[in-house]
Amino acid sequence: RSTYGGTIPWVGIHAIDWILWMSGGRFTSVRASQSAAEAANGVAPETTALALFEMEGGALASLTVDYLNPAKFPTHGDDRIRVIGTRGEIEVRDYGITLINADGVQHPENAPDADLFTDFLRQIETGVPCRLSGEESFAATRAAVLAQAAADTGETVRF
């Protein structure tokens, strides 16, 4: 770990950030596992990792990370998130949204892209807060580091 912090903080932090941002929740603990079994000669970073986060209120969030897929692999670079609750579920994948609830299956239009850099500059110039705060970024970073520690030790890590 002196030269590579781990695949969870490097690749998984983005999904961790989404989970925190979209749920508005907080993590209470994490368990994780990882493998470098597919790495060439065993000398490479972890190629896959899984993390299970427990959240305040009892919700669970799972994270799957993979690395070193071939560039032509159909899932290379794909990102997705799925949230399931008592009134339905929403899934974002392949640049589209699927909402399933009591009204059936819907495919709402995507929201326009948010330019987070412009958002950041606006905060500097006007003081209007960014959509994402520094505290939220630090929370995601802490969660990624703790998830990597859980994967490295095989222990459940409490927040």
What annotation goes with each model-predicted range?
Residues 56, 122-159:
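C-terminal helix-rich "cap/oligomerization" subdomain common to oxidoreductases
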Residues 1-43, 154:
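Predominantly a Rossmann-like dinucleotide-binding segment in NAD(P)-dependent oxidoreductases
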Residues 44-49, 149:
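Short glycine/threonine-rich loop-to-helix capping motif typified by GTGT followed
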Residues 4-7, 105, 126-131:
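Active-site rim elements
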Residues 51-53:
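Short beta-strand scaffold segments in enzyme catalytic cores
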Residues 10, 78, 132:
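Residue-level signal for the nucleotide or nucleotide-sugar donor/cofactor binding architecture
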